[in-house]
């Protein structure tokens, strides 16, 4: 798995932890080991520019996903083909604000947003209630499974 993490924000993040979560999520979703993923942390100003440019929405947001090869989750017998999964852009400052509301750490929120972004790259969405149930259920399962795997480290 080629996972590149680039922190362009002023906030320190635990890059090895993000790397482990991304690897866990991609393995869980049976994505080909040669798939490529980029995760970029940006400050609020950069995120606001991206949010306006790509979503036509004002202000910064927490996470944006930019799929490349439109890969979908695989199965144990048939993993996703190798390819460019795409880019996930996370704003740690927005994540910090959301973490306070959610009652957990900023890093936990960044991990949640990373899992959320990966699911979007693999074609999941939450525009409709059924889609939301499926996507958020997978997101929860990934985060719980990852937390359990980290306890065993």
Curated annotation (Swiss-Prot):
Q: Enzyme group, top EC level?
A: hydrolase
Q: Which GO terms describe its cellular component?
A: cytoplasm
This protein's record includes keyword Oxidoreductase: no
- From the UniProt record, give one GO term of the biological process aspect: rRNA processing
GO MF, one term, reads:
metalloendopeptidase activity
Gene3D superfamilies assigned:
Metalloproteases ('zincins'), catalytic domain
Q: Which Pfam families match?
A: YbeY (PF02130)
| Signal sequence, start to end | none
* Primary site of residence: cytoplasm
Annotated binding of Zn(2+), by residue: 116, 120, 126
Relate the protein's function as given in its record. Single strand-specific metallo-endoribonuclease involved in late-stage 70S ribosome quality control and in maturation of the 3' terminus of the 16S rRNA.
Could you identify this protein by its name?
Endoribonuclease YbeY
Q: Which gene encodes it?
A: ybeY
């Amino acid at each position: 798995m080629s996972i590149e993490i680039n922190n362009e924000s002023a906030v320190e993040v635990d890059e090895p932890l993000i790397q482990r979560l991304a690897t866990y999520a991609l393995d869980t979703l049976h994505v080909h080991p040669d798939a490529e993923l980029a995760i970029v942390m940006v400050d609020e100003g950069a995120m606001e520019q991206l949010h306006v440019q790509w979503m036509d929405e004002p202000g910064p947001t927490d996470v944006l996903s930019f799929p490349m090869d439109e890969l979908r989750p695989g199965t144990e017998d048939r993993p996703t083909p190798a390819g460019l999964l795409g880019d996930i852009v996370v704003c740690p400052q927005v994540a910090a604000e959301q973490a306070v509301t959610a009652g957990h750490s900023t890093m936990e929120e960044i991990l949640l947003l990373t899992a959320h972004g990966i699911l979007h790259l693999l074609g999941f969405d939450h525009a409709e209630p059924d889609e939301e149930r499926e996507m958020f259920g997978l997101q929860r399962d990934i985060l719980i499974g990852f937390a359990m795997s980290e306890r065993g480290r």
